[in-house]
Every structure is written in structure tokens, then in C-alpha cells.
Regions:
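Short, ordered loop/turn segments at secondary-structure junctions
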Residues: 75-77, 85, 114-115, 140-143, ...
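Glycine-rich phosphate/diphosphate-binding loop of Rossmann-like nucleotide-binding domains
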Residues: 80, 85-105, 157, 163, ...
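General beta-strand structural signal in soluble alpha/beta enzymes
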Residues: 111, 137-140, 161-164, 221, ...
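Adenosine-phosphate binding glycine-rich loop
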Residues: 164, 184-186, 190, 288-410
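Solvent-exposed alpha-helices and their adjacent loops that cap or buttress functional pockets
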Residues: 61-66, 102-103, 128-130, 154-155, ...
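Rossmann-like adenosine-cofactor binding region
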Residues: 240-307, 312-314
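N-terminal ligand-binding/catalytic initiation module
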Residues: 2-161, 394-408, 415
Length: 418
């Protein structure tokens, strides 16, 4: 192990262990200093909101923290780049997600790690506790089970259920890609797209890109066996949706003349020779973490006309889910949405991409550690520390919830405009 990696490892362990173990805690929102305070907080006073909620369940939003509480739930079957290490090992990641909810959107989140033998057991467990929360964020659940789990929970719960590994990735990817194509003078409807990877993130990304205007026949998805095509008999129902009727079978064949490469697979799977075959002014989003499908220096050495994005903060155009999930939940919770639908996702895409075209405030430049940012090849998507994301994305999402009929409360006219 290199000294640098050892130092990072020790720093990370110390960060999680000190001064107290973990990254989140419970805070009180009411005084609890006197006998009267305690009588109101618990017995006998607590009986009054209990009666109100029993008579009208919607009053749980008035008398409890339900409306600002999200469950971050995992079974630990797809932990970051580490794989299936089980529920308990996923707890630091889920606590980290809860930290991000609080830091970026003021949302209280609690991590829940579920041990189960079947997907149905997981679904039943989450559905049974769903009334406690205003929303559910599913995390680090492997494909294809994640698709079944999310869809079943959306059907059974009357609160937003959102698998961030799918839809958060898709929203941020779509926002960045639409902007990158604009910079390159291209339209998504005319663009040939190669997607390396066919798991949860890849599938959601391509589905959302189609809803944003991409043509299905222009999408070429690859898994470990090569191109996903209509002649294959080994495809599950989720991959079958992207089976292209094509004679092409390899990456080198499908990338010849491609406008876009989206990588959600693994490190170093895109050779420089493939980049050289792409159409003029290509876009490469190599989003595998911590190491991308091709390093930016290698790609730029082959093509001076490309736009490059990765999942890393040390390169331009970071494709990071934190640009989306805190704010889409903020808008959904404030509108008391029953679900997060396509209209809300597309509203988030447009809000995120629109922000990248505006002048960048000095405080954002300082937080990003740069002296200048302007819409163009090295800046097609906002920086995660941009405080404008909260009002812009949350407002767009909440308004879309109202307009699409899934909101259950009216929004103030000046919501998130202050």
C-alpha cells in the first residue's frame, strides 16, 4: 500500500471514529428543561397529538417530524465499488448519505440496514415501516433486484421512493450531457450514444435520456458479453429494453462514429483507440469510481475536440449524485408528493443544467478552489458546493409535483425564492 493511500485510509478511519463514532446524531427541536416541558413532550401531553393523528393521519406531518424525515435504506449488496459486503458494512455509506441530506438540504435522514433472504422480505420490511418517514432513499442494492424492489415499494407506499443509484445518476448525467452536446453544437435526438455498462445506473441513464429526446435506435449498450442486441438469448427483461437490432457486436464497432460515450462500468475499459474512432466533437462521461473508464489525460491526448466528464472531483465536469438527490427530496417533501415521477426528474435535469449557464458567484469559486468558471467544455455542470442548487432544483421539482398532480399541499408563491 502506498504511503498516500495509507494516509487516506487512516484519515478516513479517524474521521469516522473521532471525536465520537459515526457521522450523524439526533437533535432536539423542542425545549426539555422543565417538568412542564416533559409533560408536554411525553405523558400526559403527548396523548393529544396521538388522538389527532389517529383521527386524521395527515396530521402526522403537523405534529411529528415525518415531513422532513427520509430513510436511507440498503441491504449492502452493491456498496460503492466494493460489491456485496452485507448490510452492516454498508452503514458508513448510509450514514454518509444522511450527512449529505442534512448538509445540503436540511433534511433529517436515518440509515436503515436490512438483512433478508429474498427481495420480497426486503420489500415487506420497508413497506411495513414506511409510514414513519416522509420519503425513502434506496441505496447500494444490486441489479436486477433493485428494479423489482423499487417498483414494488413505489406501488405499496404513498411517499416518494427513490433509488438514487439509478435516478440520481441519471438526472445528473442527463443534465451534464445535454449541456455538453449544446457546447459541441449537437442535438440529443441526432446523437449516437454508446453506454458501457448495463446495470442499475446505466439502465436508468438511458431511459431518462430517451425521455429527454434520445432515439432508442441510436443507443448501443454493452455488458460483459458485448453489445446488447436483439439476437441475444441471455438478456433479462431490463436489458431486453435496450436490445438494439444491429449486426455490431463489439465496443470498437459501435463506437465508430459515436457522438457520446457514457461509462458506468469499471476502470480502464475504454481504450484510446476507441476514442479516436468517435465522431467530431464527441462527449465522454467516464463515471466509474474511483477510476474512470479512461483517464482524462489519455482521452485528451487522442482528441482535442472532446468534452470529458468523470465521477471525480479532481477533474472538470464531475458527475456527482449530490447535485441532485438532496434537492429532489427537498422539493418532493415540501410539496408532500406521493411519488417522484418523470416530470419531477426532468424538472431537476433542466434546473441543474440551467444553473451551469449562469455566472458563478465568488463564494462558489472559492469553495471549488478555482479562480474562474464559465459555461463551456470544462464546465457543463454546476459544482456540488454551489448553494444555488437547493432553491433552484427544489423549486423546480416541487412545482413539477404540483403540475403533474402528485403534490398534496399547495406551495407558497414565493417558495424557495427568498
Amino acid at each position: 500500500m502506498s504511503d498516500q493511500r495509507h494516509d487516506l485510509r487512516q484519515q478516513a478511519l479517524d474521521y469516522h471514529a473521532q471525536p465520537v463514532p459515526g457521522k450523524i446524531a439526533i437533535a432536539l427541536t423542542k425545549p426539555a428543561e422543565t417538568a412542564r416541558d416533559l409533560a408536554l413532550a411525553y405523558s400526559p401531553g403527548v396523548a393529544e397529538p396521538v388522538r389527532e393523528i389517529a383521527a386524521n393521519p395527515a396530521d402526522a406531518y403537523r405534529y411529528t417530524g415525518k415531513g422532513n424525515l427520509v430513510a436511507v435504506i440498503s441491504n449492502g449488496t452493491a456498496i460503492l465499488g466494493l460489491g456485496n459486503l452485507g448490510p452492516l458494512a454498508s452503514k458508513p455509506v448510509m450514514e454518509g448519505k444522511a450527512l449529505l441530506f442534512k448538509r445540503f438540504a436540511g433534511i433529517d435522514a436515518i440509515d436503515i440496514e436490512v438483512k433478508h433472504e429474498t427481495s420480497q422480505q426486503f420489500i415487506d420490511t420497508v413497506a411495513a415501516i414506511a409510514d414513519t418517514f416522509g420519503g425513502i432513499n434506496l441505496e447500494d442494492i444490486k441489479a436486477p433486484e433493485c428494479f423489482e424492489i423499487e417498483q414494488a415499494l413505489i406501488a405499496r407506499c404513498d411517499i416518494p421512493v427513490f433509488h438514487d443509484d439509478q435516478h440520481g445518476t441519471a438526472i445528473v448525467t442527463a443534465a451534464g450531457l445535454l449541456n455538453a452536446l449544446e457546447v459541441q453544437g449537437k442535438q440529443i435526438g441526432d446523437s449516437r450514444i454508446v453506454c458501457m455498462g448495463a446495470g442499475a445506473a446505466a439502465t436508468a441513464c438511458m431511459e431518462l435520456l430517451i425521455k429527454c429526446g434520445a432515439k432508442p435506435h441510436n443507443i448501443f449498450m454493452l455488458d460483459r458479453q458485448g453489445v446488447i442486441h436483439s439476437g441475444r438469448t441471455d438478456l433479462n427483461q431490463y436489458k431486453q429494453r435496450f436490445a438494439n437490432d444491429t449486426p455490431l457486436r463489439t465496443l470498437m464497432e459501435v463506437i465508430d462514429g459515436a457522438d457520446v460515450f457514457v461509462g458506468v462500468s469499471g476502470p480502464d475499459v475504454l481504450p484510446a483507440e476507441a476514442v479516436a474512432l468517435m465522431a467530431a466533437n464527441p462527449v465522454i462521461f467516464a463515471c466509474s469510481n474511483p477510476d474512470p473508464e479512461i483517464k482524462p489525460a489519455q482521452a485528451h491526448a487522442v482528441r482535442g475536440d472532446l468534452i470529458m466528464g468523470t465521477g471525480r472531483s479532481d477533474y472538470p465536469n464531475q458527475i456527482n449524485n449530490v447535485l441532485c438527490f438532496p434537492f429532489i427530496f427537498r422539493g418532493a417533501l415540501d410539496a408532500r408528493a406521493s411519488r417522484i415521477n418523470d416530470a419531477m426528474k426532468i424538472a431537476a435535469v433542466e434546473a441543474i443544467r440551467g444553473l451551469a449557464k449562469e455566472p458563478v458567484p465568488a463564494e462558489v469559486l472559492t469553495a471549488a478552489g478555482v479562480s474562474e468558471l464559465a459555461f463551456g467544455k470544462d464546465y457543463v455542470i454546476p459544482k456540488p458546493m454551489d448553494a444555488r442548487l437547493l432553491p433552484r432544483v427544489a423549486r423546480a421539482v416541487a412545482l413539477a409535483a404540483v403540475e403533474s398532480g402528485v403534490a398534496r399541499v399547495a406551495l407558497p408563491a414565493d417558495y424557495m425564492l427568498g
